[in-house]
Amino acid sequence: MNFIEAALLIQGSACVYSKKVEYLYSLVYQALDFISGKRRAKQLSLVQEDGSNRAVNSGTPCETEDEFLSLDDFPDSRANVDLKNDQASSELLIIPLLPMALVAPDEVEKSSNPLYSCQGEVLASRKDFRMNTCTPDPRGSFMLDPVGMCPVEPVDVHPMPRSQKDAEEAEEQPMAVSRNGSPVSVRSISQEPDGPALSSGDEDAEDVAELPEVALEPAEPRTSQQTAILPRRYMLRERQGAPEPASQPQETPDPWQSLDPFDSLDSKLFQKGKPYSVPPGVEEAPGQKRKRKGATKLQDFHQWYLDAYAEHPDGRRARRKGPSFADMEVLYWKHVKEQLETLQKLRRRKMTERWLPGAKQDLWPAEEERLEEPLEDLGVADDFLEAEEYVEESEGVMPREAAGLDAEAIPESLKYEELVRRNVELFIATSQKFIQETELSQRIRDWEDTIQPLLQEQEQHVPFDIHTYGDQLVSRFPQLNEWCPFAELVAGQPAFEVCRSMLASLQLANDYTVEITQQPGLEAAVDTMSLRLLTHQRAHMRFQTYAAPSMAQP
């Protein structure tokens, strides 16, 4: 890369960025000047206002300048109402439902009241042209009627007609007389949207005092109708009584709510329980001597089951396989399995004592403890499985050699070790059928069969010594400085010997003992390597006899 061009490029980019920084710097200063100028203009306007006020006070005329109205100089008006979500109606809550004016009528309602044209054609339904009815809100806005009734009107038990209600409100509305003699309606206290709904008697007195003075002057002679209406004009509308606070429903405690461990519970009165007398066999008298009780023997499940569930008058059950209750299935088969194992051990012991009379008696201590139990519980009088069935099953489980043992087949000099060895071999032979060979185990076995011969062959090879193989390769050269193909030097040798000779030749070339070259025609033949012997002296031998010049004696 040309460094001059690179330097010019860097200089140009630096100039561009410096101009950008200067432009941003000027923008910042312009913004600061604009802010300071606006502040100075505001100060000048304040000074001019002070000067104009002084001029007015002094009586000197000053020129009036046209000023624009600000956007927020409108007076507060009752027509503008800000609705807030947290302001709720004090009388009734508006149900947040879809207004009835926006609910589409059904097809049945449309067909029941159709709208016909002059020619008798059905144009539409009268239900399609429904007026949106609105209800004035206490805050001054108009709300759509959600359920067809005014949400701010109190719910009366006997609603009166609309016309009658309007008439009464017109009568209760106070009137006042203006300067020109025309009646003017005076707003009542209840019409104030922001004022409280209830007030005290002092406020009523103040409202009466605030009435115009014209109404307090002596009235002129009027007709009987006017005199009847006149006293009603000064009456204020009766205020409704304070509504009784609705009794809040008692909250029922949640039984699933977790209790507070640190909360103090209500104290409950102690209730005396019902006493029970202790049986004399259980009660311990203070003067009696306590005797150590032995361990109680558990009742035999088999005998208990027969006593509890036997349903025969003579006390014997029919031959049935398994209990009659599903709950006893597990216990039943567990008991049967234990009996079967005990009978098998008993039969095996009898056979051993028959052929080995001199065997030791303490070979099966656990079995002797089990055999101490009565034989009636082991299957002699068993109602579930008879003794003959145990014998048949045990004969099927015993090995075939042991089942067919006779006096002629087994010699008298048969020892216990020989019998155990035969049983173990028989067990191994019979357990082979339970071995399941998977696909992965088959692949592993094939790989082992393939790799085992190779490993054995590698173990038979002599250790690899690179100097020994180098000496053998040098000895095969006919003379110095003569090119010989590598294939001729290793002709007739196995593959692993060729690999070792190849590695030894590379070491010789590194020591400058031989020279390696390649003949043209690599694409035609793979073996194009040739070697030439340079010297018979080996490098490692030279290093052994090497002496540095500094070590030589002068």
UniProtKB/Swiss-Prot annotation:
Localization per Swiss-Prot or TrEMBL: Nucleus
Family, similarity comment: Belongs to the CND2 H2 (condensin-2 subunit 2) family.
Keyword Cell inner membrane: no
Full protein name: Condensin-2 complex subunit H2
Record field: compositional bias (Polar residues): 179-191
Any GO BP: mitotic chromosome condensation
Any Pfam family matching the protein: CNDH2_N
